[in-house]
Each structure stands twice: as structure tokens, then as C-alpha cells.
């Protein structure tokens, strides 16, 4: 599920999210390969993930990058038929603002 990533991030260009299953993270390369925005998760059960933390460097905030990370993580949860525990406040906010049925039915009660 890894996507190609542009060498540098054009503020008006597409944001591409990479999924590193081994490191259990979604990331967006910023400014070449030095800066990254990341969303970290852990498996807390066989079919349950804890979406723990989203971080975007200060210089890149306000551009919708965290929203792309949250969407990629929730789409992963749906595609893999997992349950999600939302520890990260930003992902809680994302799901509240985007209450899609496929997201809501995959939330851990």
C-alpha cells in the first residue's frame, strides 16, 4: 500500500501518504526526505489497532497533512476489517468531522 512520494512538497501539489507496516506508521515526506509527518499505531489485539499519535512539523501545519494521515489510517482499518481504538486526539477529531458509516462501524466501543 506504499505510494510514490515526490522529492519535495509543493504546497499546492498532492499529498502522498506512505504506509510502513513493519514500523506501524503512516508518513508523508516533506521537503525532500528530511522532514516527515507521521501517524503511529500499534496492534493491541489480533484485529484491533490503537491509532496513537499524529505529528506534523510546525512549519507544515495548517496544510491538511494530518487529515491525509488520519484518512489513510482509517481507510486501512476499514480495508483490513480491523477495530480502531483512537488514542490520538486528532484522529478523534477527524472521525467526528467525517462520521462515515464505514469508519464508525470499525471503532472499538
UniProtKB/Swiss-Prot annotation:
Map out region (Disordered) in residue numbers: 1-20
Domain N-acetyltransferase: from-to ranges: 18-108
Family annotation (Gene3D superfamilies): 3.40.630.30
Superkingdom per UniProt? Eukaryota
InterPro entries, per database record: Acyl_CoA_acyltransferase, Gcn5-rel_NAT, GNAT_YJDJ
Record's PROSITE patterns?
A: GNAT_YJDJ
Recorded family membership: Belongs to the NATD1 family.
Q: What is this protein called?
A: Protein NATD1
- The source organism is Xenopus laevis (African clawed frog)
Gene assigned in the entry? natd1
Amino acid at each position: 500500500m506504499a505510494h510514490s512520494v515526490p522529492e519535495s512538497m509543493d504546497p499546492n501539489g498532492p499529498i502522498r501518504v506512505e504506509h510502513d507496516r513493519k514500523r506501524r506508521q503512516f508518513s508523508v515526506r516533506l521537503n525532500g526526505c528530511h522532514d516527515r509527518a507521521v501517524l503511529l499505531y500499534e496492534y493491541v489485539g489480533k484485529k484491533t489497532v490503537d491509532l496513537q499519535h499524529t505529528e506534523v512539523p510546525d512549519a507544515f501545519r495548517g496544510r491538511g497533512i494530518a487529515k491525509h494521515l488520519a484518512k489513510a489510517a482509517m481507510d486501512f482499518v476499514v480495508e483490513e476489517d480491523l477495530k480502531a481504538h483512537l488514542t490520538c486526539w486528532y484522529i478523534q477529531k477527524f472521525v467526528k468531522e467525517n462520521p462515515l458509516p464505514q469508519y464508525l462501524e470499525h471503532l472499538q466501543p
